[in-house]
A protein has these predicted regions:
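Beta-sheet repeat architectures centered on beta-propellers
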Residues: 1-319
């Protein structure tokens, strides 16, 4: 009943039916105000985090993480979520930083990189054999083959992201690195050699010194329902409220999308937003420290759901 006053309770109680009974590992980090539940032998983790100013909890949220492989074990060590996962016949050790937002600036070395890339299982290209380059262009099919040190996951697309090569960092050539450009990378197998690689449309051998490849994080956040609230008073759940426009301020963030679903519908539709005028330096990762998005809604507050999504290889900070 949309006219009934909502029952407002602690968020940790509201998710009891959302958490599966197969969760078998728990890890905590008091200094990060975080609890992590792990469903081993699946790809899912459930993270609860809150912020307390010393008097009360000002922010609390549950999030569900899906990793590319099957989780064998996951623990919080210092400020990292350290995960051992399995895919195909291989095991991967990975670390996800909790308190350092990626700036978008990444510099590639010959075999690694510096900076935080918002991709999972991210790696520089690696030669499959001493006689084969790590990045090869197939002129006949107009594709670039990118070889990696692990076996790509079957039927799962990855992301190729351009960064700044070490030799170009801080020089005029940095502008030619096209930092922040990305393209879909499709897993493939060579029939003649059985080498596994990622395929990207177009020629990228000129950017080989700055290429990194990994799997993207698909972000999806459904925003809570809006209610009328008088200054200094609680929300009035019975008041009639029409939402004309929603303005959403985000922290260090790249591109994001917004989707709206009418109440009772199963279809999410894109909402075309507007942003305040601003600039960022050309040929750099399109990440700014703060951005404000304005969304035209023109709906009763009980007539729609609104969510934020992103499948781009850039950081997103909604807090």
């Amino acid at each position: 009943d949309v006219e009934q006053t909502p029952i407002v309770i602690d968020i940790s109680k509201a998710v009891l039916e959302w958490l599966p009974d197969t969760v078998d590992t728990l890890s905590t980090s008091p200094q990060n105000s975080l609890v992590m539940l792990v469903d081993r032998d699946t790809s899912y983790m459930y993270v609860y985090r809150f912020y307390n100013d010393g008097r009360e909890d000002l922010f609390q949220a549950w999030t569900k993480w899906q990793l590319p492989g099957t989780i064998q074990i996951a623990e919080i060590l210092n400020n990292d979520v350290t995960v051992i996962s399995q895919h195909e016949d291989q095991y991967t050790l990975g670390a996800i930083k909790l308190d350092e937002l990626p700036s978008g600036d990444v510099v590639s070395t010959s075999s690694s990189y510096t900076g935080d890339v918002p991709l999972d299982m991210v790696t520089r290209p690696v030669k499959p054999h001493s006689s084969v380059d790590a990045v090869v262009y197939d002129e006949t099919n107009d594709i670039t083959k990118i070889y990696v040190p692990y076996t790509p996951i079957d039927s799962k697309d990855a992301v190729m992201l351009l960064t700044v090569p070490t030799a170009d960092d801080g020089t005029a050539a940095e502008l030619d690195s096209d930092q922040g450009y990305w393209a879909k990378a499709i897993e493939r197998t060579e029939t003649s050699t059985n080498y596994r690689y990622f395929e990207v449309k177009g020629k990228f051998t000129d950017y080989a010194d700055g290429i990194v490849v990994g799997y993207g994080y698909d972000l999806e956040v459904t925003l809570p329902k809006f209610y009328f609230q008088r200054q200094g008073a609680g929300a009035d759940y019975t008041a009639a409220l029409t939402i004309g426009k929603v303005k959403l301020a985000v922290g260090r963030t790249g591109a994001i999308r917004f989707k709206l679903r009418p109440t009772g519908s199963n279809e999410w539709k894109d909402v075309q937003h507007t942003i305040e005028a601003g600039v960022y330096q050309g040929d750099t990762s399109p990440v700014v420290n703060e951005q404000i998005f304005a969304l035209p809604i023109h709906q009763r507050n009980t007539n729609f759901e609104l969510k934020v999504t992103s499948d781009f290889p850039y950081p997103v900070s909604l807090v």
